[in-house]
């Protein structure tokens, strides 16, 4: 029989809170959204850009800085080698832009080839095998956790460096955890609502960064006065021997550092189902926007930094001012009528660094759901919550990022060595997988597409190798160990689900439902009162032949109990179980073994009366024997436990004078 679907009624009628806890939950996270409204929660391109691209776009705040740091460590930032310093910077920036173009084209092709999302995991699994797919999945999940930790820690570091936050400067962990909680809260309200919240800061950063670059490069020709005293142009004494280490490895190291600009570029290909229809076209357009914005700002900031001869260094925990700080100070001034734009740029930079973590909150749960569908993670991660988001994945990501922040005390410099290794692992596997895909499909233009992806795979593999060699001793080896453990866990979960499916599979003819079985029904009673009546009625509905069981904890009460029972329920047999050690569970388990039938399918049903009160604190005044007994019987496949509730409506207590008269 098929039950016809009822038409969805007004949300106010179907989602009315049934309790105070439910009211607060809906107040904080919003009312549940029915499945048929899922399309309305999908993202238009203008909201999808900040949700999925804030990680990539925010990286321009430190990508150029990381390049200058690597070149400065080789002494190229010295005044005598300024031409080589500028030339090397542009060689690295140009190489990264070419790599960004290749990766963006690759993922644009991936979007149309794999419209269900999944990105590197799906591509690697389908074309290179399940093992490589799990490597990509583990790398991405680790990178998403690190993105949250690094982005929030970096943003908090920027915020706490301002004079207004001096009191919190030495307490970054609490502030970081607060931002993690806020991001969890925003994303649990729904992807569309989080996009609305985060769109403002993302677009503000893009606007202010573009204004800074434009005024810095073109402003002097139009009469705009720069403030070169805000720029650091020197290295500290003894920092490096000038020009001593110019070579291929220095360039590769600067290239690897600068490739932090590419973290997050795979996010859109993972989140295709979150886009409005047509999903693939909208996702591809958003990816193009992201690559253009990222590339333009990256080139512009690098151009302005080299034209102003910005130098960045780090020594013994001390650093030069951040490159973004130097550039905005040089363009707007740290004093004067435009100083508010300088502070606005610092706030916008800190905000987008914090919000960069939101990309992970969009993609980590979605990738987890795909892994759960493939039976490599628990099935709970495939379920959407009331707000049509993957709540379990959001919570797990927040917990892992919070633990990481606590372990590393919110220190960005200690977190950075772990970063980017995972994402370049995923890049390499994804693009290698696409090469196999094009060779197998051999559609129009397949050779050119395969060449593009092959070049991208080679380039990202080189970056991966450089990062692994350079940052491995600094802690990146931890990422490899964790990834191996995750893959072992994925395999173990998958084996369990395969065994479970084999156990539950129905082969051949449909099983007979009329096989003989004996069901012995026992009603556990602790006294003769109105609270046991619903349980007795329920037991009679199961079978007219059932027993009431009383465990004798206080022997002196037994005669009264038996007399009252015979007077009120003479037709129901009462079994009294002695319990010399005052145990409720032990005697009952022994009796179950006595009365259980001998057949393999025979069952014993234990019916437990339970009180249900209007106020939660009233429940604390009642015996908890029922839950303890249910826990003791939990592992018994031949015993079913049923709780039958009696709703208590306590009458108002009589006045003291009435109690005296009685």
Tell me the role of every PLM-derived stretch.
Residues 1-38, 499-662:
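Cytosolic C-terminal regulatory domains/tails of membrane transporters and channels
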Residues 205-235, 302-310, 430-443, 492-501:
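Hydrophobic alpha-helical segments and their helix-loop junctions in multi-pass secondary transporters
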Residues 216-227, 285-325:
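Extracellular/periplasmic helix-exit of transmembrane alpha-helices
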Residues 65-125, 129-134, 139, 150-179, ...:
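Extracellular loop-to-transmembrane helix junctions
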């Amino acid at each position: 029989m098929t039950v016809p679907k009822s038409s969805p009624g007004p949300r106010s009628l179907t989602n009315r809170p049934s309790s105070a806890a439910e009211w607060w939950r809906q107040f904080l996270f919003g009312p549940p959204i029915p499945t048929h409204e899922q399309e309305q929660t999908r993202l238009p391109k203008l909201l999808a850009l900040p949700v999925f691209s804030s990680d990539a776009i925010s990286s321009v705040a430190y990508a150029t800085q990381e390049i200058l740091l690597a070149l400065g460590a080789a002494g190229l930032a010295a005044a005598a080698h300024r031409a080589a310093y500028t030339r090397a910077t542009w060689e690295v920036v140009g190489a990264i832009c070419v790599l960004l173009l290749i990766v963006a084209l690759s993922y644009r092709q991936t979007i149309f080839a794999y419209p269900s999302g999944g990105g590197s995991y799906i591509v690697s699994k389908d074309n290179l095998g399940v093992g490589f797919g799990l490597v990509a999945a583990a790398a991405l999940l680790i990178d998403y956790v690190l993105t949250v930790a690094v982005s929030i820690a970096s943003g908090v570091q920027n915020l706490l460096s301002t004079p207004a936050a001096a009191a919190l400067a030495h307490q970054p962990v609490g502030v970081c955890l607060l931002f993690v909680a806020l991001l969890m809260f925003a994303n649990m309200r729904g992807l569309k609502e989080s996009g609305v919240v985060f769109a403002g800061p993302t677009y503000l950063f893009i606007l202010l960064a573009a204004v800074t670059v434009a005024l810095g490069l073109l402003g002097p020709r139009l009469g705009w006065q720069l403030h070169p005293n805000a720029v650091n142009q020197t290295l500290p004494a003894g920092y490096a021997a000038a020009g001593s280490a110019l070579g291929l490895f220095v360039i590769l190291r600067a290239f690897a550092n600068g490739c932090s600009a590419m973290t997050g570029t795979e996010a859109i290909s993972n989140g295709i189902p979150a886009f409005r229809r047509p999903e693939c076209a909208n996702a591809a357009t958003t990816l193009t926007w992201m690559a253009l914005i990222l590339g333009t700002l990256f080139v512009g900031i690098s151009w302005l930094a080299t034209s102003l001869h910005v130098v960045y260094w780090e020594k013994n925990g001390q650093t030069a001012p951040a490159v973004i700080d130097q550039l905005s100070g040089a363009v707007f001034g740290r004093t004067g009528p435009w100083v508010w734009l300088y502070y606005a740029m610092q706030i916008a930079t800190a905000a987008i660094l914090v919000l960069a973590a939101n990309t992970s909150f969009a993609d980590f749960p979605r990738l987890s759901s795909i892994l759960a569908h493939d039976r490599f993670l628990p099935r709970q991660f495939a379920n959407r919550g009331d707000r049509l988001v993957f709540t379990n994945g959001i919570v797990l990501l927040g917990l892992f990022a919070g633990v990481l922040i606590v372990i590393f005390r919110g220190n960005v410099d200690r977190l950075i060595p772990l970063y980017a290794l995972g994402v370049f692992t995923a890049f390499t596997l994804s693009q290698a997988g696409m090469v196999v895909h094009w060779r197998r499909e051999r559609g129009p233009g397949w050779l050119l597409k395969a060449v593009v992806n092959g070049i991208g795979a080679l380039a990202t593999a080189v970056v991966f190798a450089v990062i692994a060699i350079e940052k491995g001793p600094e802690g990146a080896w931890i990422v490899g160990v964790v990834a191996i453990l995750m893959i072992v866990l994925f395999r173990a979960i998958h084996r369990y689900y395969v065994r479970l499916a084999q156990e539950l599979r129905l082969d051949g003819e449909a099983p007979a439902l009329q096989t003989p079985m004996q069901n012995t029904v026992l009603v556990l009673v602790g006294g003769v009162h109105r609270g046991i009546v619903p349980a007795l009625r329920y037991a009679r509905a199961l079978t007219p032949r059932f027993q009431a069981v009383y465990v004798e904890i206080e022997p002196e009460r037994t005669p009264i109990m038996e007399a009252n029972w015979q007077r009120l329920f003479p037709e129901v047999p009462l079994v009294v179980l002695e319990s010399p050690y005052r145990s409720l569970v032990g005697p009952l388990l022994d009796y179950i073994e006595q009365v259980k039938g001998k057949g393999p399918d025979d069952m014993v049903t234990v019916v437990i009366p339970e009180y249900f009160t209007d106020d939660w604190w009233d429940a604390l005044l009642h015996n908890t024997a029922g839950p303890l007994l249910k826990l003791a019987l939990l592992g018994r496949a031949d015993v079913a436990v049923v709780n039958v509730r009696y709703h208590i409506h306590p009458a108002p207590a009589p006045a003291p004078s009435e109690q005296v008269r009685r």
